[in-house]
Amino acid sequence: MKLAAPSLALLLSTATLVSGAWNRRSRSCGGVLRDPPGKIFNSDGPQKDCVWTIKVKPHFHVVLAIPPLNLSCGKEYVELLDGPPGSEIIGKICGGISLVFRSSSNIATIKYLRTSGQRASPFHIYYYADPEGPLQFPYFDRQTIIATEKNIP
């Protein structure tokens, strides 16, 4: 039997790294999410502000994988908080490159905010749990995320 091409093997390896039970999806405007992995979708409902708090088991960190966003900067954006609601805002994002962020604890919060009259632009964010210990791959740090805030009020 002939083996698959190297690119196919790489694709299968990548799929294995991100595999999981993706039946946990949140299309609601906010809430507390547990038991990763999961996927957050924004809502086009009447709510202007949505807050999702992700809590994973103790001795784990929350990892957020954010594909490139295409939000209307100045009218809508996503805030990342390193901890529960009320924690320090570590970044505001409305567009740009993909980001992967690892929280400093087992809690992270995502806020989606938009101005009145602004229709919600679709986006999604993946969340995972990562055990405490050395980083397994590079994550964006606070300074990198702040650099994406230039056009956000």
Swiss-Prot record:
Post-translation changes: Partial N-acetylation differentiates isoforms AWN-1 (not acetylated) and AWN-2 (acetylated).
Modified residues (N-acetylalanine): A21
Name of protein: Carbohydrate-binding protein AWN
UniProt record similarity statement: Belongs to the spermadhesin family.
Subcellular location: Secreted
Cellular component, GO annotation: extracellular region
Native source organism of the sequence: Sus scrofa (Pig)
Protein's UniProt keywords contain Secreted: yes
Signal peptide start-end: 1-20
Record Pfam families: CUB
Major subcellular site: secreted
Function field: AWN proteins mediate the binding of boar spermatozoa to component(s) of the egg's zona pellucida by a carbohydrate-binding mechanism. Awn proteins are secretory components of the male accessory glands being coated to the sperm surface at the time of ejaculation. They possess as well heparin-, serine-protease-inhibitor-binding capability.
